[in-house]
């Protein structure tokens, strides 16, 4: 006698389906959340490893009549004359006849990444400094880029890509995006590098992008479990690494790939201008009663003409007619929000009251003032 029948699915397929079913069921349970683990290198920076900002001043040529008006932008005219003079073209005696509209003075900016070497290329951004209406189709002439110390670290040149257009006629014009700012991919060549020797560093600091004691402790804990006692938490932002007995490059590579679960503070960010509200998952409120309603006063002016009868000797006059209407909005009941309410429950409860984003901002401010909002409220 046989007690088993052959299943239409292989055992491995059934196992996978049961596992998926259990996982989906857990996700549907109230209050069940999955903490997201991230790599250490995605939430920290290494001390001393950073980019440096560069800036320069130059000329863009080849514009189709959309450049600076030389009579208004004196610096553009002087820069053009000086550049032509360096190239052996002397027009000082005829500078008043210089009437071109195909040149624009621009500011050039770029970021010099860490560990970059001479000859490497970087992206540059070009922005109009004068009254040019568009930089579309222009070419940036060779422009030195300096850092805050006044030294030249890169040189930029190339054709601009603006991702915009501008057209105008006798009575109308149209502009899409920002034609007075452009981008040159790989338009800068590094001439000087910032020295940074990582191979001989005995100590190194990891800097958290979002300072937090819990996250810093978790980072130090996972590093110490993997490499031994080499990590010490100095403050909520800094974890000190002792690499004296390790190869810094390979060790930092392995540390960066370690997974850690960052702790997020209970925080509510409100943008009053746009009505945007961002609330973290750990936001809680104590027991509080909420009632919300709107008051709208509408004043309508309807002027009427008063016409006197024939031969009455009266004069025609405009008589104002004012209608005032008060609307208190639909009636909302007083709702009691229990203590320990989560983000989902809070939003659902406020939506049940018919509360919009802007009204929700006022309610959150009132709850915070009452001391019932157990989170930081940041207004922007």
Swiss-Prot record:
UniProt KW keywords: Bacterial flagellum, Periplasm, Signal
Any one of the GO CC terms: bacterial-type flagellum basal body, distal rod, P ring
Signal sequence, renumbered to the chain: 1-35
InterPro entries in UniProt: Flag_FlgI
Database matches in Pfam families: FlgI (PF02119)
Protein localization: Periplasm; Bacterial flagellum basal body
Main location: periplasm
Any one of the GO BP annotations: bacterial-type flagellum-dependent cell motility
GO molecular function annotation: structural molecule activity
NCBIfam families: PRK05303.1 (NF003676)
HAMAP family xrefs: FlgI
Cited PANTHER family: FLAGELLAR P-RING PERIPLASMIC PROTEIN FLGI (PTHR30381), FLAGELLAR P-RING PROTEIN (PTHR30381:SF0)
Quaternary data: The basal body constitutes a major portion of the flagellar organelle and consists of four rings (L,P,S, and M) mounted on a central rod.
UniProt function note: Assembles around the rod to form the L-ring and probably protects the motor/basal body from shearing forces during rotation.
The family this protein is said to belong to: Belongs to the FlgI family.
Protein name as catalogued: Flagellar P-ring protein
Organism: Gluconobacter oxydans (strain 621H)
Gene name per UniProt: flgI
